């Protein structure tokens, strides 16, 4: 997108194994989000309000699974499974940074490196 206030925000996100994107939701403001995997392999997790995994989807172009749609207000997160993974993210605009209440309180903050490592290991075992 050309401007942060465009009605649709689109971005390419290049991710490597070990990248931590804290589980979050898009509730305030409510926004659906779409991930299209262009290359690599990524696990997409959906969670309930307690942090329990309710759904796991492996995005893998080699298997013909290219995308996931996340409904507004749904807790979600990713685990990068293959080096060189690139996703195309599409979300309603205008861009708004995530408010603190949109980060999952049951997930470790990025600066908690030990907690993040343990959490990512748990996600990996859930696949």
Regions found by a protein language model. Give the residues of each.
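Glycine- and acidic-residue-biased ligand/ion/polar-headgroup-sensing regions
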Residues: 30-50
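Double-stranded beta-helix
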Residues: 52-53, 58, 75-127
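Short acidic-glycine-tyrosine-enriched beta hairpin
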Residues: 34, 48-73
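Short beta-strand His + acidic residue motifs that chelate non-heme Fe in jelly-roll/DSBH
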Residues: 23-24, 44-46, 68-70, 76-81, ...
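His/acidic/aromatic-lined binding-pocket segments of jelly-roll/cupin-type domains
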Residues: 12-13, 32-37, 68, 78
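A short glycine-rich, His/Asp/Glu-containing loop-to-beta-strand
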Residues: 1-25
